[in-house]
Amino acid sequence: MSFRKYYSWKYPDVPEDVAPLLLELKNSLVVVGVVGRSKCSLANKMSVFGMQPEETHEPANGQIMCYYKPGTSTLLLHFESTHDEVVLGQKLLEQTSIDFDHFYGNMRSQFVRMMLLALHTCHIVVYVETGQTFDPALVTICQLLKYVREQHLLEFLPQLLRETSAGNLLGDRARLCTPRILFIFENYPADVEKTREFISTHEFQTEDKIYELFRQYNIVMQSASNSLLALPNNKQFVFYNANEILRPDRLLLAIDALNATMYKQDVKEEEEDLEIIALAPFEGFVKPFGDAYTVRKSDEQLYRESHTVWHFLQRHVQDALEGCFDEGSFKQLSQSPPFQLLNFKTWHMCMVSIHKLLVGNVEDVNYVSTNAHYQAYLRDFTESLNYEKRFWYHLSELGLKKGISAYKHSAAVTYGSAAHKQMLANATLVFEEEGRGPYAELALAKLNDVCLRYWHDGRQQCEFPSLRGNPCILPRDVSHDKHSSGVVHISSCNCGRTLGRREDPYTLRQANYDYYEHMAVMCNLCVKVKRFQFPVFTPSISDYRAAAFEAAFPLLLQAHKNRAEPQVEEDSDQEANAAEEPYSQPATEAEPEPEKEPQASANEWSQPMSATYGSDLNMSIAGFGVSLKEGGAEAEVEEAEVCDKGSQDNSTSSDTSTESEIELQPKERSAQKANQILISTTEYLPGLVHMCSGLELLPLFPSWSLACVGPSSIYSHNTGLQEHFQSGFLSGANYLLPWDVQVRLVQPHYKHQQQQLMGKKNQRYRKQGDRLALKIFIGFEYECSRGHRFMMRSPERVLRGGADIERDTSTKVINNNMPLYFPCPCRAQNTFLAQLMRIHVVTPKAPVNIILDPKVLVGKYTFTLGCSILPMLSQSAYWILRLPYVYQGDNEIIAPPEKIEPTNRLAGGCILAGLFGIAETESMELKEPRITSMTFTRLQSHAYK
């Protein structure tokens, strides 16, 4: 490379020795602006021109360096901007925000300012690219330049320039000309040969690509006044540096200089020289390294020497000096002077004015202009260039509109929170199809807010949860007497004959009482059956209420009471306070209060049992004398013991034993206190009766049902339960399980007088022997919400028809805890949980009564019938015990589990073993053909192994 002397200085200062040289040019000064990218530490893009700044030069954003070669008409302006790598690094170090979009927008706006200054003060703009290919991002920059010039600058720049010393020199276009843009690529592709043909071909291809893009986006147009830039029509405007090393290693340059000083050209060798060379120790000795003088430069070498940036630039400078700058670039030439060559002084004056308007005043934060357009330019320049921001904002708004439309389109008249969340999720998916970018998060928040307000605008459902956890679907803003979830269950009546549609209950009364009373009117069997009357609350005043916390929920304070007062004192205090309570009434004579005595004396009326044949049973068995109705004194003692000890699993399994023999021995009666249980008539029990709730508080309504649906003959073990009698049973699961029991009565010697009083019928009955073979049929019925009913053969298996009937008996269901919930075997996509709803008992034709004492363990509660005297089922009859549909403890509704794990089927609750007991029928009752009285006594349970 040949080095020439040049001058360099920083704008706006002009060296004293350079100003006269520039003034000598008069109106032949061509200003060339150099912009673009650089990678060196000095931000120098002038390396292609063989120019370098001083070593002490410090790059800065917006700084302008001027270069001039004496003897030329070209003034080079080097613009340092954020596209220079070193300047961008400085901005990164100054950056405090982590928002990349904001940082990128600021860097781009600062570069656009420098480009605007170059377009209005230069005749030729040279864009230097460090890459090997054209960057399409420059097209976007040019579009922004065109937008800013046409929408902002032309609104204020010509007017403001007239107010400066520049006056009307630049005219209405406010620039010297439509600047011609040239492209210089510092690096040539490595995979392309560096020959004249390949270099020219590559340059032409790049020119075609650039021209096509500029014409496509209206950067270069047919009219000079409407075009942002100009491209020469018949001249090269793309240059690739294929030969020259722009930033060589200085050490290598020093070595090359040393070799050049030692270089000596070969001359024609004489014969004497040949003789001298023959004396050399080896070939080439003392022969200089270099080309022979006869060697001439090839065409490729000549092309490389002439293919320089300076020569490339001077061809376009020459067009400007000759006045043919716009010829060939535009088809339509403007009437105004298209091109102006100014002297240095005039140009410098215009440069100062334009620089102050476009760059200088922007940096002054206190500057205020009276021109509204110019003030808007100073204030909103960066925002107006942030097209990505507008683009992301437009996408977010478009996605927001589609998301809101999708939400409203799928919205019903009223809907709940679950539907709202699902529709909002669908609307979010619709939004994400369009909306993205930095505004997506704000748009999503707005979408959520708009959809929420739309939902709350009269479309919100009540959503009060039912006892099964289903929300109410009635409008929230409209008053309604009762809730409705819209969920309908199929359920049977008390006797099981009629199936009906049950609305999802919201109160305990709806679940356990009202529905069955409604079905009793519709069922022609329920109106005929004899039902056991459970004790319920009978108010004595009009303003009765639910029991207070301490009275209604004694379970929470039981431990404190047990520690505070002894058992004996508690009994005496209770008797003393009984007469002083005006809101209480004594129980009937058939329900005497149990005496708080030791268990040995309290159980005098219960009969000891002895099981033979190795049977394993768990039930209550007793014989009753004349005073049967006085034998219920142990009821409260038993409940107190169970409450203290907790719910225990008394079940034992007997898979092989099918017969049982029970020995009944009537005990001698003893005198008992006639204590009375004080039943409250002003406060009722809000929940279900359980082991620790006491007997002084009664519920408003019975949650259980016990009914005799007919004689035992209505059930045939060969056909099972017929559809006309019990509807809804699954095929093969409509059978009861047999329970074979042998009972032996041992009569003590002091009862001989009582035996003589028995009638002949009883005597004939006794003559058959002291053993009675009883066949009882038992069934544990489960019912799912779809109305499917089935019996269980064991705690783990459903009854499957004839084969199970022949092989199994009821020992597995009697001697084991039965689960309260079990998966329904019906074929459905979703597994429904069936609930234990009924217990079927077919009593035998024998002088014994079956006693029911169900205890349902759910969570920490053990629910009972709440009777002081246990129900005693009559002989030769079909009895059905209907269990509660919903269980409520002291202060909570116990919801059914969502699913039952096969490894722990009792987790959702169970009915404890020891449900059934057997008692001998009184002799007086045998003489009467009617069904025994519905006043029974509680018996003490025993387990035998």
Curated annotation (Swiss-Prot):
Known function: Involved in nonsense-mediated decay (NMD) of mRNAs containing premature stop codons. Probable component of kinase complex containing nonC and recruited to stalled ribosomes.
Sorted UniProt keywords: Nonsense-mediated mRNA decay
Region (Disordered) residue spans: 563-604, 633-671
Highest rank taxon of the organism: Eukaryota
GO biological process: nuclear-transcribed mRNA catabolic process, nonsense-mediated decay
Family, as annotated: Belongs to the SMG8 family.
UniProt-listed InterPro entries: SMG8-like
Keyword S-adenosyl-L-methionine part of the UniProt annotation: no
Protein name, per record: Nonsense-mediated mRNA decay factor SMG8
